[in-house]
């Protein structure tokens, strides 16, 4: 559908019987109204043509071949001079055959049928609105017991209130035997309400605003009672309060969307367009049909049987009528959601029929596979790997993917710069991978964002915009901080990349969808760009260090000299036999890059004169004196060098290269943020 802002959208919800009839009914040029499917047949076995008023009827759903009716007559489509617009013999319109992809039909049900999604799916919408146990409603829908319908100011044959009690269940079986079908209908319409019709009557009598008011009053009363001290009673009250909240939210949703509660009970059953449930002829002349066709046939058979019982036969016991209504209800349940009530229906080969729910839900359903997961132009797909050197708003795009996605832009660039005379020459240069092609590709990519999407896209952060950069290999590089929004990890996950073409799409991507502009969760407002998985493991490895204490590697006098003054060339000496001293962090990282020390090797790093360390009353582990009078106080994680007059000359802390690298990254990030903030103010 298209709203008032001209946005295309898809809305799923309950609709009225009038709306279903409007979708499926069409008026032929001769004034005849068609749309109701009354026969369970598909194609005639001799002529291989659709049966009239059947599941593939050309009068209802349109011609199989464009402009050709069931009789074989042909008319030019769209020609105003051609008259008439339909065949007077078979009643088929001369229209495009693509109408069979969206033209619906309907089945007029002989009795109301409850929509199984609203009854059996948890939470049950019908049970919530009626405030009745689900088991009780199921017994009513499937004709296990009945409601008495007391009529005011009139004498009633049954003096009952509410439900038949279980000890007098025999009434349900004995009363219908005394009435013919017509008499039983009169009696039942006056005295007893059973089946989905009883549910529909109760839903139609509901006032949603009164439900909201009463539920809020009851919720407040339960809140005022407080805790009783009995754990079981407190849990019962808590469950009741949660139920009232769900009931209020459901009623508000119905009011907001202009949905009537009784629409959850079907009187008209929509029939899908035939192209969405096709019958295909395979090798050998055999036919392969969609399971939905067989389920529709089952519904029509049972519905026609019930119609015959209610209209033609006058001596059928009422119990048989109720049993047939139950069969119609079960057939519609199987069509909508096979197996929701227990054992699913199977065919002759013990294969479970694929119902409407199975067609649309799941990874291989209509939405995730056909609509959301369909292949589109200007898109690609590849495995994601971590790109630790990337900025948060950038992603690494393999050259092979980038040149395919931006090929048209590169061709335009080659022609504009007079490097190619036509499209063919430009494509030839791209196939040969000339250096100028990569230069133009870099220019094109600088100002063009791309969209990355990881299925399933459950919330808006499942698709975000990035500035692409060329990388080697065949995998898409991604910053690890954006993984939580995508719910992705680097164990083989795949992501799709899309190129926004229009200027509006590019502006929307830059203003709303860039990853550095989506740092908070839209659901709860908490930060979502936080270190997870690989980053946490990396931080742990970076800062774990050597777990050995200071006492394991005793103080070595050769450590007193600065590392820069060391003249030894044996790298293993620094790596395994001592803990070197460094005057600053740059020397320590330089030694690590020269592979003189390991990432987790303990070392001593000169530190600023920290007042907290100076004022500490901790007792040193060891004190070593030198010949010139200076001495070293060695503690668990730091070392103090004092002069002969006990003045502090230097302070060294015991750390690792990993800790130093993390500290420098944090310090640079804070300084960069401070500079950006000062520029902004």
UniProtKB/Swiss-Prot annotation:
Gene3D superfamilies reported in the protein's UniProt record: 1.10.40.90, 2.40.40.20, RNA polymerase II, clamp domain, RNA polymerase Rpb1, domain 3
Keyword Endoplasmic reticulum: no
Subcellular location: Plastid, Chloroplast
Gene Ontology cellular-component annotations: chloroplast; DNA-directed RNA polymerase complex; mitochondrion
Keywords: Chloroplast, DNA-directed RNA polymerase, Magnesium, Metal-binding, Nucleotidyltransferase, Plastid, Transcription, Transferase, Zinc
Keyword NADP: no
Entry note: cofactor: Binds 1 Mg(2+) ion per subunit.
Cofactor section: Mg(2+); Zn(2+)
A single GO BP: DNA-templated transcription
Membrane-traversing stretches: none
EC numbers for this chain: 2.7.7.6
Recorded GO MF terms: DNA binding; DNA-directed RNA polymerase activity; magnesium ion binding; zinc ion binding
Residue positions binding Mg(2+): 489, 491, 493
Recorded family membership: Belongs to the RNA polymerase beta' chain family. RpoC1 subfamily.
Quaternary data: In plastids the minimal PEP RNA polymerase catalytic core is composed of four subunits: alpha, beta, beta', and beta''. When a (nuclear-encoded) sigma factor is associated with the core the holoenzyme is formed, which can initiate transcription.
Function noted in UniProt: DNA-dependent RNA polymerase catalyzes the transcription of DNA into RNA using the four ribonucleoside triphosphates as substrates.
Protein name, entry field: DNA-directed RNA polymerase subunit beta'
Species assigned in the record: Atropa belladonna (Belladonna)
């Amino acid at each position: 559908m298209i709203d008032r802002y001209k946005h295309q959208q898809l809305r799923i919800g309950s609709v009225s019987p009038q709306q279903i009839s409007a979708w499926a009914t069409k008026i032929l040029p001769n004034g005849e109204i068609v749309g109701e499917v009354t026969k369970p047949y598909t194609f005639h076995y001799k002529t291989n043509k659709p049966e009239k008023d059947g599941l593939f009827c050309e009068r209802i759903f349109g011609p199989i071949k464009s402009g050709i009716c069931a009789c074989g007559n042909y008319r030019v489509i769209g020609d105003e001079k051609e008259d008439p617009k339909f065949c007077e013999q078979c009643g088929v319109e001369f229209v495009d055959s693509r109408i069979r992809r969206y033209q619906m039909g309907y089945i007029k049900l002989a009795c109301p049928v409850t929509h199984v999604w609203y009854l059996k799916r948890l939470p049950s919408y019908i049970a919530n609105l009626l405030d009745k146990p689900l088991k009780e409603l199921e017994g009513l829908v499937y004709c296990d017991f009945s409601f008495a319908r007391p009529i005011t100011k009139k004498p009633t044959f049954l003096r009952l209130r509410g439900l038949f009690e279980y000890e007098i269940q025999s009434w349900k079986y004995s009363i219908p035997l005394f009435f013919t079908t017509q008499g039983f209908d009169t009696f039942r319409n006056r005295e007893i309400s059973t089946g989905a019709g009883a549910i529909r009557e109760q839903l139609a009598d509901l006032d949603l605003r009164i439900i909201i008011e009463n539920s809020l009053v009851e919720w407040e009363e339960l809140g005022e009672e407080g805790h009783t001290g009995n754990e079981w009673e407190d849990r019962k009250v808590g469950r009741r309060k949660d139920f009232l909240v769900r009931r209020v939210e459901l009623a508000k949703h119905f009011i907001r969307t202009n949905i009537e509660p009784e629409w959850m009970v079907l009187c008209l059953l929509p029939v899908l367009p035939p192209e969405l449930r096709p019958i295909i002829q395979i090798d050998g002349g055999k036919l392969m049909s969609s399971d939905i066709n067989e389920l529709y046939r089952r519904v029509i058979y049972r519905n026609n049987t019930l119609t015959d019982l209610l209209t033609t036969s006058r001596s059928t016991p009422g119990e048989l009528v109720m049993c047939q209504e139950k069969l119609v209800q079960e057939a519609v349940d199987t069509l909508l959601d096979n197996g929701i009530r227990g054992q699913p229906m199977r065919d002759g080969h013990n294969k479970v029929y694929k119902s409407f729910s199975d067609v649309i839900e799941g990874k291989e359903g209509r939405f995730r596979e056909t609509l959301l997961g369909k292949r589109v132009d200007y898109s690609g797909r590849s495995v994601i790997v971590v790109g630790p050197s990337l900025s948060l708003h950038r992603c690494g795009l393999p050259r092979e993917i980038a040149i395919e996605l931006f090929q048209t832009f590169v061709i335009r660039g080659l022609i504009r710069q007079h490097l190619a005379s036509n499209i063919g020459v430009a494509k030839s240069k791209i196939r040969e991978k000339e250096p100028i092609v990569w230069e133009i590709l870099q220019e094109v990519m600088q100002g063009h964002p791309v969209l990355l999407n990881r299925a399933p896209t459950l919330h808006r952060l499942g698709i975000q915009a990035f500035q692409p950069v060329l990388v080697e290999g065949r995998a898409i590089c991604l910053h690890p901080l954006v993984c939580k929004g995508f719910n992705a990890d680097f164990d083989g996950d795949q992501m799709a990349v899309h190129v926004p073409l229009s200027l509006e799409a590019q502006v929307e991507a830059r203003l709303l969808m860039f990853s550095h502009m989506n740092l908070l969760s839209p659901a709860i407002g908490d930060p979502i760009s936080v270190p997870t998985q690989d980053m946490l493991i990396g931080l742990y490895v970076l800062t774990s260090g050597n777990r050995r204490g200071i006492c394991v590697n005793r103080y070595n006098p050769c450590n007193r000299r600065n590392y820069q003054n060391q003249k030894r060339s044996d790298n293993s000496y620094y790596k395994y036999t001592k803990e070197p001293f460094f005057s600053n962090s740059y020397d320590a990282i330089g030694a690590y890059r020269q592979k003189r020390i390991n990432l987790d090797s303990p070392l001593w790093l000169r530190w600023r004169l920290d007042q907290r360390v100076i004022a500490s009353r901790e007792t040193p582990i060891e004190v070593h004196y030198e010949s010139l009078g200076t001495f070293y106080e060695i503690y668990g994680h730091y070392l103090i060098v004092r002069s002969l007059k006990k003045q502090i000359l230097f302070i060294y802390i015991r750390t690792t290269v990993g800790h130093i690298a993390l500290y420098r990254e944090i310090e640079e990030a804070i300084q960069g943020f401070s500079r950006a903030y000062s520029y902004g103010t």
